[in-house]
Amino acid sequence: MINKNKTRIGSIHEVNGSDFVACLISEAEGFKPEITIDDTIVRVAQVGSYLTIKQSGPDILVIVESMWFDQNNEGKQVMMLRVNPLGEFTSETGFQRGVTHFPTLGAELHLMSGSRLEKIFSRHGTGDFNIGRLSSFEDVNVALDASAFFGRHAAILGQSGSGKSWMVASLIQSALKSMPNAHIILLDPHNEYSSNNSFTNTPVFPADKTRCVSANELEIPYWLLSYEELIELLVDKEEEYASLQIAFLRGVVLDLKRDSNDSLHFGQITVDSPVYFSLEELYKTFKKYNERTIDFGKGRTALTGKFDSLLIKLESRLNDTRYDFLLRPTVRNATNTLNDLTKEFLGLSKPTSAVTIIDLSSVPHDVLPTVTAQIGRLAFEFNFWNPRCREFPILLVCDEAHTYIARERNTSGHKSARRSFERIAKTGRKYGVGLCIVSQRPNDLSETVLSQCSSYFCMRITNPIDQEYIRSLVPDAAHGILDALSSLSQGEAIATGEAVPMPLRLKVNAPNPPPNSQNVDYAGMWSKKNPHVVEVDEIVKRWQLQER
């Protein structure tokens, strides 16, 4: 049993609704800057550490926000603390968020033991889903509530080089150990996870649980696009005849879908049904009505010349090889191929996999939003129509999310991606579709998506605009600990939200093996005695063919 007199370090002098002010005991009363508890040396009241307030009723857990010197009524210098309340210890449940019994003036302030903190995490976390250790208590493992993290959306935010890729790899590795039947889809824009690691020549995730596919191999065909997405792809809404083109497009697509699938006896087919239709026939139909004349070529119909811009836009897309995965499918060119696409996408094709890594590194930057929009929509639609969706939860990990789920960019692809992921953010948890957003520019992300996240893992961020934006997202109790954002070390994070029992600062477990995200070794490469021979001809050929 820990001696209460040994852990007492001060008393409460001021109580507000959101924070308390405490005065530390003086050196004459036994103050020491460091105290040993459970064979562990504890620094007294360092910023970001945890303390307890003791009086009759449940103990209150608080976190230190700041400390300073002041003068008491006798003119003597005293040490003061500002602490934020996090929750209460109860005999029934161990620990619960929120404070119902506020302390009175004079209540004792005590140090926390590592064993007591360990109990909080062991009761809150899920099995062996450990992701790191407390920065202030390195012996205390941090376990997450997996259902809250995966099912209620989470965000991993931090500037380049802060360790986001490490954390993603570590999280998934830990999840696969404790939850081997996971269904995780990882969008990998920089090929950091999908190929063998160039440093250890070892796959980042177990090979028997992982399927790696490129966006081109996956082949997400145009006929899966919704009617709204087809409009954004083909119609210039600022054009004079845009309304006519939109209305005519609806009728043509619906007729083509019904005619192409008549033998399948689907019954009712809508303009949004994911069934095959011929893009060539669509083009021919618009061209026919655009060129139709009357009176032996002397007169024009109401539609003559009204589809010029749509035809030009469609021809432009068809001639752009970057859109071949979408507009010129070689495998997904029949309605029944959707079954195989879905199985491959979700890791259900033989052999099955727990993680599907979609390598997006070969996808051009301006086409990326269109690709990711379809991936997000496929995941949502599958479980939306799955009557047992609660038994098949899916997680979408969106690395570099700001490049395709952007707040303000208004290209057709960005609008489509924003709409797709905002729908998941708002209603995905009802159908077992979760998001993990990973970004170095939180202020550039869709506000709707980020605000729907229930857990935030904030790594080093020095940009003042991004720091302020993060503060606007998290609860007030975490604001003090967020002051450390710019001083976090690589691989260190501040965690808040429902996946953790309280705001905390932790050191993320190093992934083993790590992703292929290490910085380029300029000094090493430039000082080599036998440098690598650059194959300029091969590189230029790849560039010209748009193949990586």
Question: Which role fits each region the language model picked out?
Answer:
Residues L187, C398, V438-S439:
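Hydrophobic residues in beta-strands of the RecA-like P-loop NTPase core, especially within AAA+ ATPase
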